[in-house]
């Protein structure tokens, strides 16, 4: 998204950009390890790792996340049909997706996601290309007022 799109359209800009990606996206196989425990490899359509409850435009992807709890929250969405994904994304926007089929939600101190190919990954607004994403909590590295 361009800065202009974000300013003009707000949440709608994220939805429009996402719709284009959904239509052409080929879900990768992702080997997931959380806190040293392997969850195996599956095809995932979406994953987020958050320190707060919302992502782009206010969507509540990690409704249990708190910046001061010493944990990161991960939400992984298994690959599904386009209509199923669109319905799930509506629930995700409101933070009502945690009990949905195909959704894995964990609170963690460390995680690794290894993709079967290089992917473009949005890391807090910056896009990087990678085959592995590693996340870990660094206690005391930042101070927050909550």
Q: What do these predicted ranges mean?
A:
Residues 1-146:
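Long C-terminal subdomains/extensions of small-metabolite kinases
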């Amino acid at each position: 998204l361009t800065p202009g799109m974000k300013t003009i359209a707000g949440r709608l800009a994220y939805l429009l950009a996402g719709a284009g990606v959904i239509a052409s996206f080929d879900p990768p196989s992702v080997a997931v390890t959380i806190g040293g425990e392997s969850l195996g490899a599956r095809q995932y359509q979406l994953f987020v790792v958050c320190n707060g409850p919302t992502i782009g435009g206010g969507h509540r992807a990690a409704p249990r996340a708190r910046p001061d709890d010493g944990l990161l929250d991960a939400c992984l969405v298994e690959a599904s049909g386009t209509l199923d994904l669109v319905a799930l994304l509506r629930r995700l926007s409101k933070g009502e997706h945690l009990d949905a089929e195909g959704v894995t939600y964990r609170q963690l101190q460390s995680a690794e996601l290894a993709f079967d190919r290089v992917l473009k990954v949005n890391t807090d607004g910056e896009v990087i290309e990678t085959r592995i994403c590693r996340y870990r909590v660094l206690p005391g590295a930042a101070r927050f007022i909550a």
